[in-house]
């Protein structure tokens, strides 16, 4: 579908060599806007949904003053942050201080280029899409480190050090989760990973949700979800910005839009981790049962992603913050050994007569 739109636009401007040469660049800009604009809207309203859901879980009202049912609260928050003065510490490294937030949010937005929204709907149908996303998202930690170092604050620097150690630790476990999914799917292409989950005895019987990867790879799915919470520095793994000890971590010296960009990067990463988990383990745009195939795939993808994101919020409302040593122990002594063992189990499973992914 994306290719058809591109070719149609190219034919319209082909009469002029100048517009024909400009069209590919313009098309890429249009695709970027088509992803970034809705994503920023989803990120803004995720903050409202989080506050509403936390309010419900704590038996209180969430934001309900700005607009009907508080629906304009994200716009009010954004306007407030836009009007705040941006203050740089006198001893901060000026250029790097500005670069930090940009480096934090760019990977969270750029990784969406390889996410498929349907069998023929992806900005870039990359054969090594999963590898590309891993490479892009691994850059995000540099934004945090740069912000912590450039702030010239001991609290910010301590938060940056914690962030780098935590994100690198859980990236290893997530990498092994990706490797297991690649093994059972036989591809790093995210579209092919989704299509591989539409095969099998249960899918043929109309119960597609029982053929998705979450069931045979349940331990890997659980490790991925918890590692995703840690990767996005969400509660209970938010010691990077632990309010009770290091104030706001690497963001302590930021105000106005600098702080807002870090905030947006965190929530954009939540959406990315959620939709990636849905793509790898929950069938992507596939309907759970054949009787519901008439519902468009993008609705299923959005609904599943919304449920996974809501799980992030439920975890925040339920669990206390872990100590830093507990977080490191969980990553290195539990998740990495578990994923390595399951890597061997799945390898043997694929070579056995009981291989269900044939």
Curated annotation (Swiss-Prot):
Residue ranges of the TM segments: 29-49, 95-115, 130-150, 167-187, 209-229, 258-278, 295-315, 334-354
PROSITE patterns (UniProt xref): COMPLEX1_ND1_1, COMPLEX1_ND1_2
Entry's Gene Ontology cellular component terms: plasma membrane
Matches recorded under Pfam families: NADHdh
Quaternary data: NDH-1 is composed of 14 different subunits. Subunits NuoA, H, J, K, L, M, N constitute the membrane sector of the complex.
Record function comment: NDH-1 shuttles electrons from NADH, via FMN and iron-sulfur (Fe-S) centers, to quinones in the respiratory chain. The immediate electron acceptor for the enzyme in this species is believed to be ubiquinone. Couples the redox reaction to proton translocation (for every two electrons transferred, four hydrogen ions are translocated across the cytoplasmic membrane), and thus conserves the redox energy in a proton gradient. This subunit may bind ubiquinone.
Protein family: Belongs to the complex I subunit 1 family.
UniProt name for this protein: NADH-quinone oxidoreductase subunit H
Biological source species: Paracidovorax citrulli (strain AAC00-1) (Acidovorax citrulli)
């Amino acid at each position: 579908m994306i290719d058809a739109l591109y070719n149609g636009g190219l034919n319209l401007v082909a009469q002029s060599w100048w517009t024909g040469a400009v069209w590919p660049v313009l098309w890429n800009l249009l695709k970027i806007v088509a992803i970034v604009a809705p994503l920023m809207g989803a990120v803004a309203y995720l903050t409202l949904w989080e506050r509403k859901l936390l309010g419900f879980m704590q038996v209180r009202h969430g934001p309900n003053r700005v607009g009907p049912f508080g629906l304009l609260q994200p716009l009010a928050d954004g306007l407030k942050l836009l009007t705040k003065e941006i203050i740089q510490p006198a001893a901060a490294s000026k250029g790097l201080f500005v670069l930090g937030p940009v480096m934090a949010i760019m990977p969270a937005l750029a990784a969406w280029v390889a996410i498929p929204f349907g069998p023929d709907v992806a900005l870039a149908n990359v054969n090594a899409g999963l590898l590309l996303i891993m490479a892009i998202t691994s850059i995000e930690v540099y934004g945090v480190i740069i912000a912590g170092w450039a702030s010239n604050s001991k609290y910010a620097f301590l938060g940056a050090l914690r962030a780098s150690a935590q994100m690198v630790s859980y990236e290893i476990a997530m990498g092994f989760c990706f490797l297991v999914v690649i093994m059972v799917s036989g591809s790093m292409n995210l579209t092919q990973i989704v299509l591989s989950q539409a095969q099998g005895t249960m899918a043929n019987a109309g119960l597609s949700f029982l053929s998705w990867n979450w069931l045979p790879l349940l331990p890997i799915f659980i490790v991925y979800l918890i590692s995703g919470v840690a990767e996005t520095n969400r509660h209970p793994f938010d010691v990077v910005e632990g309010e009770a000890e290091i104030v706001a971590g690497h963001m302590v010296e930021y105000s106005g839009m600098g702080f807002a960009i870090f905030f947006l990067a965190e929530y954009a990463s939540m959406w990315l981790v959620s939709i990636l988990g849905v793509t790898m383990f929950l069938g992507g745009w596939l309907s759970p049962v054949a009787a519901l195939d008439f519902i468009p795939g993008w609705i299923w993808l959005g609904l599943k992603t919304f449920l996974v994101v809501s799980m992030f919020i439920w975890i925040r409302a339920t669990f206390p913050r872990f100590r830093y040593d507990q977080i490191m122990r969980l990553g290195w002594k539990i998740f990495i050994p578990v994923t390595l063992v399951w890597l061997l189990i799945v390898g043997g499973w694929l070579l056995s007569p009981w291989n269900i992914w044939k």
